[in-house]
């Protein structure tokens, strides 16, 4: 991807993306003025919860839970009070819920993935997440889902990553993903020779919305393939 640059850090990665001036972050819905991060900011602010509880997991992490309006929320905070890992927001009045994956990128909290559920079934029209699928002994397919309930033109998806094969870093690879209805995918090949292999990187979707603005979606990836 023209604007993609990946800088590898000890934890995993820090991603920077040179943006056109009119590019905007993904909105919660097409008519919303809030980004996804802003949309969930109030509900995941523990200072606004009732029946707040916390439990120390280790020296750097604590598990928190509480109630906000009609929602029961659980998640994790790091030693600086920043949100990390998977958070769950459950509507106490129905069978709907959402899972959020927070990543610390630089000093910022970013929502890398969010998955909406209806009756425990994933609502792929609203969700942003990735999954892996084993094709054969030498190939894994990385599948990236982004919300499809939006006007999208000039879509493209790019995946920048490196492989860690038996603790040896295998360069940085940028690929343009193939696209099916509602998702993107790319195949990771030639992994059979590795006894242990991890993939670390980021997927970027770029498109124009109904107003002609450039909109981006980012999914950070840190996954064991075997």
Where are these regions (language model features)?
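Low-complexity, intrinsically disordered regions enriched in charged/polar residues
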Residues: 7-8, 34
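Hydrophobic h-region of N-terminal signal peptides that target proteins for export
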Residues: 8-17
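Glycine/tyrosine- and acidic-biased, solvent-exposed loop/turn segments at the edges of beta-strands
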Residues: 16-226
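Positively charged n-region of N-terminal signal peptides that target proteins for export
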Residues: 1-4, 19
């Amino acid at each position: 991807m023209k604007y993609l640059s990946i800088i590898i850090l000890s934890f995993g990665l820090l991603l920077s993306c040179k943006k056109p001036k009119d590019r905007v972050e993904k909105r919660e819905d097409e008519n919303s003025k809030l980004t996804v991060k802003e949309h969930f900011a109030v509900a995941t602010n523990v200072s606004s919860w009732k029946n707040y509880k916390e439990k120390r997991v280790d020296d750097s992490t604590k598990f928190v839970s509480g109630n906000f309006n009609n929602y029961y929320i659980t998640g994790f905070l790091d030693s600086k009070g920043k949100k990390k890992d998977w958070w769950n927001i459950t509507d106490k009045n129905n069978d709907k819920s959402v899972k959020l994956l927070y990543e610390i990128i630089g000093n910022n909290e970013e929502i890398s993935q969010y998955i909406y559920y209806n009756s425990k079934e994933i609502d792929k029209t609203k969700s942003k997440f990735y999954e892996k699928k084993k094709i054969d002994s030498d190939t894994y397919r990385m599948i990236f889902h982004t919300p499809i309930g939006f006007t999208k033109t000039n879509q493209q998806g790019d995946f920048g990553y490196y492989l860690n094969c038996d603790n040896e870093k295998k360069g940085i690879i940028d690929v343009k993903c193939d696209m099916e209805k509602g998702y993107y995918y790319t195949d990771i090949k030639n992994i059979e020779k590795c006894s242990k292999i991890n993939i670390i990187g980021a997927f970027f979707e770029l498109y124009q919305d109904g107003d002609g603005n450039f909109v981006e979606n980012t999914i950070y990836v840190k996954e064991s393939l075997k």
